[in-house]
Amino acid sequence: MRNIIVEPLNQTPIEDQKVEIVERKGIGHPDSISDGIAESVSRALCNAYLDRFGAIMHHNTDEVQITAGESAPQFGGGEVIKPMEILLTGRGIAEVDGEKIGLDRIAISAAKEYLRENILNLDVETCAVVECKIGHGSGDLRDVFARKGRAPLSNDTSFGVGFAPFSETERIVMEAENLLNSPEFKKKHPAVGEDIKVMGLRENDNITLTVACAMVDRYVSDLEEYLEVKNVVRDEVFKIASKLTDRNLEVFVNTADRCEDDEPSVYITVTGTSAEMGDDGSVGRGNRANGLITPNRPMSMEATSGKNPINHVGKIYNLLSNQMAGDIVESVEGVKQVHIMILSQIGKPIDHPKAATAQVILEDGYTMDEVTGKVSGVMDAWLEDIPSITEMLVKGQLRTF
């Protein structure tokens, strides 16, 4: 019997709160690049372990650090003077039953491939130096297969949190960044780099979006063209946000620009990310497991990306909580808002947490007696099927930042 608790949440629903703040760091933000590399390295190791040994061996690659380089951007195209440095650290199994695997090679290859696929104007070979300092360990397949068929044991006493549904402001912030970094948008507007941050503020029924967007200098010939691209970004963000809300909207882009000065100062880059000059990055310093930073909502400080997907509850429980929450609001009639908290106990099976709690706000006309059993059933089903979280992670089907 699992310890599942369902209780009412005595809190003003998010849409009725007077002030709401939401942030998303886009895929080209240095912190997000760190998250993306960490997760891609973990996924590459998982698949390499499965191919070679038939099982995922222990590893954690969640300690990626980016040290910014130096660049000289200018209209029409500048240059990278000093490449950014990317340090891969953590721990991984490099030898199983006397058979070695190229852990460093796999990690470096995965990191570079991630950069090529996601930072389109970055020359990975000349503008980034990737160094692997992942600690090497050895493993025994007999121990791994002896545990097969049983739930993994929690590696820590930790917790995960999630909530659903997204508010209007949360959806707008997420969709705005997703639009600006979509392949379709990049084809139409190559001057828009990947280092994008969207900050949303809702004051009652007034939503203000502040967008920071690194422009790629080679696609912008002068100040006039830069301002044209800024206007496109503003208009497209306004357009997609308008489809998601009837509230009043205002959109600002690159508010630190100084265009009227004798020597204009604007946000242009050589590569599309501020990591090329002055902006460092670290895993876990940006978006939470659901892709947003939401001070109005419950959040865990745990970094999700790069942690092993087998028994690292700091990763699994945060992702599981969000899956649970989404299923509850979708399938349980009468639930207006739900917060999920799951707590592990070190050394105990991860499918039997110390406590799994759902706090719910109901629609008018519904009672806790009507929803408690259904909510508990959704949570129990997800805990029973917890290996599916691992499977989705290995296949790259779950976003971790």
From Swiss-Prot:
Key word Transferase present: yes
Keyword Aminoacyl-tRNA synthetase recorded: no
GO biological process, one term: S-adenosylmethionine biosynthetic process
Pathway it works in: Amino-acid biosynthesis; S-adenosyl-L-methionine biosynthesis; S-adenosyl-L-methionine from L-methionine: step 1/1
Cofactor(s) needed: Mg(2+)
Annotated EC: 2.5.1.6
Reaction(s) catalysed (UniProt annotation): L-methionine + ATP + H2O = S-adenosyl-L-methionine + phosphate + diphosphate
Pfam families from the UniProt entry: AdoMet_Synthase
UniProt xrefs under InterPro entries: AdoMet_synthase_2_family (IPR027790), AdoMet_synthase_3 (IPR042544), S-AdoMet_synthetase_arc (IPR002795)
Binding site for ATP: G135, H136, G137, S138, G139, D140
UniProt keyword terms in alphabetical order: ATP-binding, Magnesium, Nucleotide-binding, One-carbon metabolism, Transferase
GO molecular function terms attached to this record: ATP binding; magnesium ion binding; methionine adenosyltransferase activity
Function: Catalyzes the formation of S-adenosylmethionine from methionine and ATP.
PANTHER family listed in its UniProt record: S-ADENOSYLMETHIONINE SYNTHASE
UniProt family annotation: Belongs to the AdoMet synthase 2 family.
Name of this chain's protein: S-adenosylmethionine synthase
Organism: Methanothermobacter thermautotrophicus (strain ATCC 29096 / DSM 1053 / JCM 10044 / NBRC 100330 / Delta H)
Gene expressing this chain: mat
